[in-house]
Amino acid sequence: LIGLPVGTTALEAELRAHWRFVQANVLLTSTTPQGLATQAHAQVQELFANAEAGDWQFSLGRKVVGWDVGYGFRPNDVVQQEARRTLLTVTPQGRPLLLAETFGSDTATSIVWVNPQSHHDAPPTTAGDEAALAARWYHRSGARDDHLFARWGRHTRASLGAAVAWVATDELELHASARWSQRHLAWQPLGSAPTENPWRMAVQGPATQWLLGAQWTGASQQGLMVEWWHDGSAMDDRGWDRWRQRNTALQQTAALPGLPDGARSGVAGQLAWQTTPLGGSSLRRNNVFVRASWQHEAWQLAWDTLYMPADHGQIGTVSAQWQADQWRLTLAWRRLGGPQQALTSALPSRHTWLFAAVWAF
């Protein structure tokens, strides 16, 4: 959502391999912050083995398992918990898991043990790192797809969800999803040491999440999508007010004349750590998302905006994509806007440009 720090250039390359029953995906990145040396990094996105036994299929390793309906937000994405609306679409880093699935002509059942290695009593560093058991049941009934979900997390306990997607006409598709959680994980400023990140993932009370959406596709490959959702696991308005107050206090401290260099560096570090809670699936609890697109032969043009009614903040994106047999080129621009009191106006980066070239071989 928030993009790279100001003045930062990044290059990414994604490599995939498939050998017998083993699949792998590796992401190579090179990041060059303004005025600093380039940093290279390699990360295994997926590495898992598949097997079959009767009507069941099994996967073991690090794998992406994405559930639920919806584009801008997915309440029942209880395994992968993938970041949505990213500027560049790459394979996310899968979760360590053991997956068992069975398929019928119109049904499917999936059972997952995710993050089995995470058995600590303290809350995980991110919500997606929690050890949990999850299950999904899927049924297709004509033009309607039905989903039921259940999850038991080590820290968040029980959650139940349901989703439906219905192709109402040749041009119109409707979808909805809802989830109730006994507990949820959220960022809280719990630390006090000046040399440590004060933000910690903490267990909070019950939360509800839901999404309503519609997608229209025209005869000339033009499309319009509208989604409205509530994310009860996002920080509430009072929490963001405290976040802004802390931002202001740190900026005022950094501007004090005669502040020692050591203290100034400490304040700069605290300001950098203020970006920690910005990585959630939703910044505000209530959101409206609109996306328009048009495809003609090898070209696809798209525009979308995420609107947050709480403070009238907006995140808008325009993109153009050209695709041939082996190449896909993408140019995109994202802008964060809104009035001065909007959360998006306080974020460190307001504009992000992207050029991506993908070669399949």
PLM regions and their residue ranges:
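Outer-envelope beta-barrel architecture signal
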Residues: 9-11, 18-24, 54-56, 96, ...
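Residue-level signature of outer-membrane beta-barrel architecture
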Residues: 15-19, 50-53, 101-104, 137-141, ...
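Outer membrane beta-barrel
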Residues: 16-116, 338
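Outer-membrane beta-barrel "beta-signal"
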Residues: 290, 327-329, 335, 347-361
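Residues that define the transmembrane beta-barrel architecture of outer-membrane proteins
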Residues: 5-13, 40-45, 92-96, 103, ...
